[in-house]
Swiss-Prot record:
Tissue: Expressed in axilary buds and in non-growing stems and roots. Detected in sepals, stamens and carpels, but barely detected in petals or leaflets.
Name of protein: Dormancy-associated protein 1
Region (Disordered): 30-60
Pfam families the UniProt entry points to: Auxin_repressed
UniProt-listed InterPro entries: DRM/ARP
Family from the record: Belongs to the DRM1/ARP family.
Low complexity: compositionally biased ranges: 41-59
Induction: Strongly down-regulated in axillary buds within 6 hours after decapitation and then up-regulated.
Highest taxon of the lineage: Eukaryota
Keywords: Developmental protein
Cysteine pairs bridged by disulfides in the record: none
Originating gene: DRM1
């Protein structure tokens, strides 16, 4: 029945010999004379566990307010000191957006 349901496109190539390749379950009886013991060998793949990421206790780390840093860029402690020095002061003789928009090369020819 498995041969009829197997789909090469979805499931890939068929195993070499039926379900024995997918699940191996062997049971052997060992005779020690007076007592009979049942020996069982099972090889079924186990499900891997999800790895756990180590975390710092919440009391030990500083919680940053993401929205405050997005809407108030100067409040970000990592970039607070460079904001005014780098982003707010352009270099001398740097063209502005208006210079670029209204120059002869980039001005729209459609009138």
């Amino acid at each position: 029945m498995l041969d009829k349901l197997w789909d090469d496109i979805v499931a890939g190539p068929q195993p070499e010999r039926g379900l024995e390749k997918l699940r191996k379950l062997t049971t052997t009886l060992k005779d020690d004379g007076a007592s009979n013991q049942l020996m069982r060998s099972t090889s079924i793949p186990t499900t891997p566990t999800t790895p756990v990421t180590p975390t710092t206790p919440s009391s030990a780390r500083k919680v940053d307010n993401v929205w405050r840093s997005v809407f108030n860029p100067g409040s970000n402690s990592a970039t607070k000191s460079i904001g005014a020095h780098v982003f707010d002061k352009p270099l001398p003789n740097t063209p502005t957006v208006y210079d670029w928009m209204y120059s002869g090369d980039t001005r729209s020819k459609h009138r």
